[in-house]
């Protein structure tokens, strides 16, 4: 029986996390990024996110098999209660429930911070090909996200144009006098 653990990422995890991400940059349009960032650049990205938001890894038998994090939706004060999510799993670890577990943990932590709305920006093919399928959008829909917008031909990679969709999941109720969102460092256990 395998042991599955979700925990906060550490900067020391960056090399393994980058190894997972590099696959998606080099071989897919799941990431619209063209070049794999350096380890130093990736560590800096992690540090910036960790200043306010959770950055999680999921381990199976002690090996990091995926990661997910939240970050600012737009970067203006009025949007503080909304967060964009990102998730990547080792390509050999997909379809085993790890993504669901990781996203559920992330959503729980964001809810404790006071986040109300979750958003996912997803590459979407007009026609599925070897670089991009509709699996990510279907995964998000399965977790309760709803399609809220499509940007046509907005990403160009591997000499092809791809659409991008935004999906949304509401996890809290807005009201007048909404308490400020707390940094993750104040709510993590």
Describe the residue ranges of each PLM region:
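Glycine-rich phosphate/pyrophosphate-binding loop shared by adenosine-nucleotide-utilizing enzymes
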Residues: 4, 63-67, 162
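A short beta-loop-alpha structural element at the N-terminal edge
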Residues: 5-17
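Conserved GNAT-fold acetyl-CoA-binding loop/helix
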Residues: 18-45
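Acetyl-CoA-dependent GNAT
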Residues: 36-82, 86-92, 104, 109, ...
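Conserved catalytic-core motifs of GNAT/GCN5-like acyltransferases
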Residues: 69, 121-123, 137, 141-160, ...
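Conserved acetyl-CoA-binding loop-helix of GNAT-fold acetyltransferases
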Residues: 95-111, 133-138
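Conserved GNAT acetyl-CoA-binding A-motif
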Residues: 110-132
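Short, cationic low-complexity segments
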Residues: 181-189
